[in-house]
């Protein structure tokens, strides 16, 4: 009788329409219920309704009220958490194929089918790529997925690499090379093979793309400065613009440096052989002559030439550093000419470091963390590697060469790929001003600092550098780390703009064309100017792809490292090991710290810091945790921690602070 009653249907619709409707993101818990997080409020989702949604789904919901209790009833899917995703294969008790999503907050198995293109016979625990095909809120059917790609077996020791590369849709293979390579640049090159160029790299480096030569400039038998000659490998001599290799490099943008091995941007026979500046082999190069005074100031316009060069020695960072630091039983240069080059480069570098202190910015010394791996990918140890003097020699030569390239491209080509950074995000300039005043101002300097750290001043390169020089001598990293959150991201641009992070008016990299596509583009522009050939302005799609590829590569490196840290630290839980750590972030849920010995990221749950949640407050302006009204922990603090748990499935390392 009531079945098709239009009045009843209308009444139901009116009741439904009168209910509050909200949009939000689903958050699951380790129980059957969940929550809907909306802009201003969080609503409970009951267990039966949670079966229709997944953690991370953006949905529309109606709010059901029972007395003073409210709960969200999912209505429609706005954006699913899952489209393409990484998963592990499982078979249920009826031997039906399912997938387990590789995500710390999603633990429900999803029914799946294997695409015909996937030929492997799937086994329990295999890693795969899947796509979500049906969703209960969208398709009126249960969750269901298709497996589109096999990644590797469950017991593959290299799973951290293969799974992470698949997650970020990056190839694990080098670019396919050509059958043979011909020199396309038949233009005249200067013969600079007589100059005593040297390369300085890691012992294991195969893709040497920079070589250095230096000599003093003298007037009336008195040294007045330096002439530095920077030779950079020239892969564009072999790569046609319309070639498949060019298209691949344009897509990859960078060589991917991963723990244990790299995946080159160019075919290995180019990156490691034909273009690499191997000792005693003649190679095509783009060369820049740079002149400075003894204080490191550039005194002449840079002079670029196409040339042939021949490195006379392949030197290693650690050996050169040991030699210059006069370590016991240190390596010695093989020839007096090489020794002379090392000493001159050392003197030049000291002058340039001093120049930075006055005219631009130097970075605070932080180590790189290197994984030492066995053949099978097992982590044997993790080394903290500090930048030593030989690293600084190469770094300073590359920085000055890139300053010169920016100047040349800006003046001669009016375009290029420039590395830029505009300092504080405009929307955070006020915050940065107030933070600096709160931490550095007192009664005596209040007026002076109000001017010095005014919003207008902090927005200029000079004002920003002045502020950085002010905080440089301060022992703690607190100011540095807090201010970092107010900064904008570095960007690639096609026109000259300052790089606040380096403290420079302009910066354009061209010194790593084997490893960076942006440097290949700048090579072509410099060579076109030299040859008086036409060229085009750098396209926005190239800049956008560079930006995205840089972000992807950093995520790949971080994700693999997180996984390897878990494998390395898991056996140490039973040993109750202790570490010194730096607080990196402060959240409601706890602290994120970095272990100083090996670089691993550890989570400290708030429940281990204090037993009364009501007495804990996070101050998001200071990035600090207050307990009973006292500031107890802040970003940059050094704390002693104990390792308590490692969960490899979610790549999480948990610890507690030792009071």
From Swiss-Prot:
It is an enzyme of class 3 (hydrolase). PROSITE patterns: RIBONUCLEASE_II (PS01175), S1 (PS50126). Residues 189-531 form the RNB domain. GO terms for molecular function: exoribonuclease II activity; RNA binding. Keywords: Cytoplasm, Exonuclease, Hydrolase, Nuclease, RNA-binding. InterPro entries: CSD, NA-bd_OB-fold, RNase_B_OB_dom, RNase_II, RNase_II/R, RNase_II/R_CS, RNase_II/RNase_R, RNR_Ribonuclease. The keyword Cytoplasm applies. GO terms for biological process: mRNA catabolic process. Its EC number is 3.1.13.1. It catalyses: Exonucleolytic cleavage in the 3'- to 5'-direction to yield nucleoside 5'-phosphates. PANTHER family: EXORIBONUCLEASE 2 (PTHR23355:SF37), RIBONUCLEASE (PTHR23355). Involved in mRNA degradation. Hydrolyzes single-stranded polyribonucleotides processively in the 3' to 5' direction. This is Exoribonuclease 2. It comes from Haemophilus influenzae (strain 86-028NP). The lineage of its organism: Bacteria, Pseudomonadati, Pseudomonadota, Gammaproteobacteria, Pasteurellales.
